[in-house]
Design a protein with these regions (language model features):
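N-terminal loops that bind phosphate or other acidic moieties
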Residues: 1-308
Length: 308
């Protein structure tokens, strides 16, 4: 049996490559031939998923985090000349410091500028996992134009107008701060043309700022799977999943896109926790104990190989 192990990350527990390795270990122990192809939807870790699938070279840059502290960040140059830049590499969300009214996306702009200075053929910008809610104002202070074609992998569909109420609380905003963010966003007249653009709310409004510069906002999971050349043909089994399977898993998340593209092939979706079974696909819950996530995935892979 040929199996494709293509999980997304179990956030805060296992990165997607480690989850894929654990699944593949179990599949091989059960006698299957297994290939590892970790997946992502545009958030943190997307560049590494693409590097594993396509190759490429990491580049380093000195930038500033969301609160103007110096940090080193890296971006990925793919073999075809595309620069892959993650917002979370520069201005990551830090649960120990949540201040959405003060956080700036300037550091992400610095990282994008560093990638552009290297002369890439194109940009693939990955949005998600940031501390920022500044509608991309910091980015726009640094990057005035995109000199090459740019695609943006977004892990949400929310618009700029919706972002404060949806994402503000995740980044530490209480009701008063959400109201202030809504006021600030409303005053950004230069963003009026992209205020209601789907995915413009990604990464605290970075999507809208990039759309203003002419970048194309795309569903992250589909974009990443296309770039990684996901193809289930020739496999007898596809195994995917994430930390929590719920009603949103089928709505643009990476495992949902894997399952959709695997129609006609036996597909199993796992969840560290399963709130809602994935429609029409065998759904398996792990133990739910983060400390045992890796061994759970090894055991799942072995069981799937032995029982099919």
């Amino acid at each position: 049996m040929r199996a494709l192990a293509c999980p997304a990350s179990l956030k805060g527990v296992l990165a997607a490559p480690l989850a894929a390795a654990a699944l593949a270990e179990g599949l091989r122990a059960g006698g299957a031939e297994a290939r590892e192809l970790p997946v992502a939807d545009g958030g943190e870790g997307t560049a590494e998923v693409l590097r594993l699938a396509l190759g490429g070279e990491w580049r380093e840059a000195d930038v500033h985090d969301a609160f103007a502290q110096p940090r080193s960040a890296r971006w990925l140059l793919l073999p075809d000349g595309t620069a892959v830049v993650e917002s979370a590499a520069a201005v990551p969300l830090d649960p120990e410091r949540l201040d959405p009214l003060a956080a700036s996306s300037r550091g992400f702009g610095e990282l994008v500028a560093a990638a552009l200075a290297a002369g890439p053929e194109a940009l693939l910008l990955c949005l998600g996992g940031t501390a920022t809610m500044d509608a991309g104002a910091g980015l726009l202070d640094v990057v005035g134009e995109l000199s090459v074609p740019a695609r943006v992998a977004c892990d949400v569909t929310a618009t700029l107008a919706e972002a404060p109420s949806i994402f503000g609380p995740q980044k530490g905003a209480g009701p008063a701060e959400v109201a202030e963010l809504e006021r600030r966003f409303a005053e950004l007249e230069e963003l009026d043309s992209v205020r209601h653009t789907p995915r413009g709310g990604a990464a605290g409004g970075l999507g809208a700022a990039l759309a203003l510069l002419g970048a194309e906002l795309l569903p992250g999971a589909a974009l990443v799977l296309d770039a990684a050349r996901f193809d289930p043909s020739g496999y007898d089994l596809v195994v995917t999943g994430e930390g929590r399977v719920d009603a949103t898993t089928a709505l643009g998340k990476a495992p949902g896109e894997v399952a959709r593209r695997s129609a006609g092939t036996c597909c199993v979706v796992f969840g560290g926790v399963v709130d809602v079974a994935f429609p029409g696909v065998e759904t398996v819950a792990l133990s739910g104990d983060p400390a045992h996530a890796r061994e759970d995935l090894v055991a799942l892979g072995r069981a799937l190989a032995v029982n099919r």
